[in-house]
């Protein structure tokens, strides 16, 4: 599946909340078109996040209010998969946190099934910085599993921990962002081309471009 330079980029948004990923992508470029989204909060009769999402984006929200595990086969072909999957089970502050084996931690496997079914060109995921060390009993296991799953499906991966406070937010909020790209993309070609003399000399290219933190910018 190839995306031409001028065509729309079909986006699927999982664990959509009130639409944070969608807003960010649409502000970035009109090419990003969310064609399907999912938001479901177990045990919450009000489903307020889903209602807020639907109100914000109207009839074109394309948001399904159902358990993600029950609608995997409904996810249409897409170019970019995004999602901020639940973070509660990745807390290393609690020795009882089960990480990827926890009640909400297992939702990673729904993401993985969707990737296996559709193989989008790009995947962008977000979670707490503690994901890197989860679970407390076996530090780094969960993050390693996620990276290995993506690698086995033919993806190259980059990741970053970004603090929202560095970009004008009034609170410290450190989040892990995982960017995966299929081995058929130009991004993958760029990554693999780094494993040459440049890589040996420490000049490996980064595919994730991050603006300078707000606190480092001069005020005009």
Language-model-derived ranges and their functions:
Residues 2-122, 128-143:
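Core alpha/beta nucleotide-donor-binding catalytic domains of modification enzymes
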Residues 65, 155-166:
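Conserved S-adenosyl-L-methionine
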Residues 73-75, 168-171:
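Short glycine-biased active-site loop of nucleotidyltransferases that positions the nucleotide triphosphate
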Residues 82, 159-161, 177-179:
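Conserved hydrophobic/aromatic beta-strand scaffold that supports enzyme active sites
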Residues 140-157:
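Conserved Class I S-adenosyl-L-methionine
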Residues 146, 158, 172-176:
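Residues that flank catalytic or metal-binding motifs in active/ligand-binding sites
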Residues 170-188:
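Conserved beta strand-loop-helix elements of the APE1-like EEP
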Residues 208-220:
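Single conserved hydrophobic/aromatic residue that forms the stacking wall/gate
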């Amino acid at each position: 599946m190839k995306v031409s330079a001028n065509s729309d980029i079909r986006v699927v948004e999982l664990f959509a909340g009130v639409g944070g990923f969608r807003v960010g992508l649409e502000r970035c470029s009109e090419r990003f078109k969310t064609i399907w989204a999912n938001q479901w909060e177990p045990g919450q009769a009000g489903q307020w996040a889903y209602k807020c999402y639907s109100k914000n984006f109207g009839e074109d929200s394309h948001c399904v209010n159902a358990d993600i595990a029950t609608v995997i086969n409904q996810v249409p072909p897409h170019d970019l998969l995004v999602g901020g999957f639940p973070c509660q089970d990745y807390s290393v502050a609690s020795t009882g946190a089960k990480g990827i084996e926890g009640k909400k931690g297992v939702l990673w496997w729904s993401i993985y099934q969707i990737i296996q079914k559709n193989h989008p060109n790009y995947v962008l995921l977000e979670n707490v910085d503690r994901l890197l060390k989860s679970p407390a009993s076996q530090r780094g296991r969960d993050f390693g599993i996620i990276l290995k799953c993506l690698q086995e499906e033919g993806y190259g991966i980059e990741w970053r921990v970004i603090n929202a406070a560095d970009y004008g937010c009034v609170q410290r909020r450190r989040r892990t962002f995982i960017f995966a790209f299929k081995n058929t993309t130009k991004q993958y070609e760029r990554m693999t081309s780094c494993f040459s003399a440049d890589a040996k000399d420490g000049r490996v290219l980064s595919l994730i471009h991050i603006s300078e933190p707000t606190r480092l910018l001069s005020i005009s």
